[in-house]
């Protein structure tokens, strides 16, 4: 079977995602019914994390265990990567010892170089540019609650970060619209927006205008990992971009709210919203587990018809 990687959302086509969502539903149901499903017995996942994580690490580690395999966690302190070993050399060695690899790092180029030299599938657990596993879970969560996402309007409020970039990629594949509202100076980079085209993306100055008639409102922290030295500046710049009840009232009545977590109540979102009836944040977080199990199964076994 040809080795496939999941480094950006665009690495798969719509039919593949629809298959993954179908598998996710089945795998999640088996999990909820306490039925054992071990298709990855004796398979090993290596998790190489340069960035700290709660949800990504836990969902991959628990997910691999629940599929019958095992997982090994490696921080940069645990490998020669943190001591200057070439990425290419690390990939050649590690991929001879495990069956699949998840990497969480800063520069997207690092994960691309690793994948080019890997004998096994590589999954992007997060880079500064993209977070495809998050959007995989987000779209599945939307479908669970509202059905097809095609033709819907997704509004992103806040920093145009890796999650925002991945939403733009997904819009091209699933044919939905993305409204983005950021403070001046934090807009989606023109070159990056050009990669996704303009048919599915629109930039707004006012967050209230951006959420008008939205089917989903989503946001993230104002200060991502690696930008801690900008904390005070960003708090000032993003002061008008807190998703509160007034802002949500501009969206459709049945609009959902999502946040990839961790959340800072009173900053990017009010407690009234994230803990309110429109929030599906906890389902979204749980679905990281189930969508990633389907992803690992697909990358290692291809299409299967277990029912």
Swiss-Prot record:
L-ornithine binds at residues 162, 220, 224-225. Pathway: Amino-acid biosynthesis; L-arginine biosynthesis; L-arginine from L-ornithine and carbamoyl phosphate: step 1/3. It is found in: Cytoplasm. InterPro entries: Asp/Orn_carbamoyltranf_P-bd, Asp/Orn_carbamoylTrfase, Asp/Orn_carbamoylTrfase_sf, Asp_carbamoyltransf_Asp/Orn-bd, Orn/put_carbamltrans, OTCase_ArgI. Keywords: Amino-acid biosynthesis, Arginine biosynthesis, Cytoplasm, Transferase. It comes from the Bacteria. SUPFAM superfamilies: Aspartate/ornithine carbamoyltransferase (SSF53671). Belongs to the aspartate/ornithine carbamoyltransferase superfamily. OTCase family. Transmembrane segments: none annotated. Its EC number is 2.1.3.3. It comes from Nitrosomonas eutropha (strain DSM 101675 / C91 / Nm57). This is Ornithine carbamoyltransferase. Carbamoyl phosphate binds at residues 53-56, 80, 104, 131-134, 260-261, 288. Reversibly catalyzes the transfer of the carbamoyl group from carbamoyl phosphate (CP) to the N(epsilon) atom of ornithine (ORN) to produce L-citrulline.
């Amino acid at each position: 079977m040809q080795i496939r990687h999941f480094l950006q959302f665009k690495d798969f086509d719509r039919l593949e995602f629809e298959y993954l969502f179908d598998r996710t539903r089945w795998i999640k149901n088996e999990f909820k019914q306490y039925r054992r499903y071990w298709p990855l017995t004796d398979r090993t996942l290596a998790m190489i994390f340069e960035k700290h994580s709660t949800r990504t690490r836990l969902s991959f580690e628990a997910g691999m265990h629940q599929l019958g395999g095992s997982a090994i966690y490696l921080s940069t302190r645990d490998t020669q990567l943190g001591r200057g070993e070439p990425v290419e050399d690390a990939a050649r060695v590690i991929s001879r010892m495990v069956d699949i690899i998840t990497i969480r790092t800063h520069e997207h180029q690092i994960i691309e170089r690793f994948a080019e030299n890997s004998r096994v599938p590589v999954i992007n657990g997060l880079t500064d540019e993209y977070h495809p596993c998050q959007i995989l879970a987000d779209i599945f969560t939307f479908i669970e609650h509202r059905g097809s996402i095609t033709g819907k309007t997704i509004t992103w409020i806040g920093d145009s970060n890796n999650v925002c970039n991945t939403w733009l990629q997904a819009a091209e594949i699933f044919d939905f619209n993305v409204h983005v509202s950021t403070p001046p100076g934090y807009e989606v980079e023109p070159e990056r927006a050009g990669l996704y085209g303009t048919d599915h993306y629109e930039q707004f100055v006012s967050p209230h205008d951006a959420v008008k008639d939205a089917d989903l409102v989503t946001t993230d922290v104002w200060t991502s990992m690696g930008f801690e030295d900008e904390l005070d500046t960003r708090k000032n710049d993003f002061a008008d971009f807190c998703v509160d009840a007034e802002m949500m009232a501009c969206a459709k009545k049945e609009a959902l709210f999502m946040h990839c977590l961790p959340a800072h109540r009173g900053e990017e979102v009010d407690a009234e919203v994230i803990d309110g009836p429109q929030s599906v944040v906890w389902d979204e977080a749980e679905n990281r587990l189930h969508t990633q199990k389907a992803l690992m199964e697909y990358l290692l076994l291809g299409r299967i018809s277990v029912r």
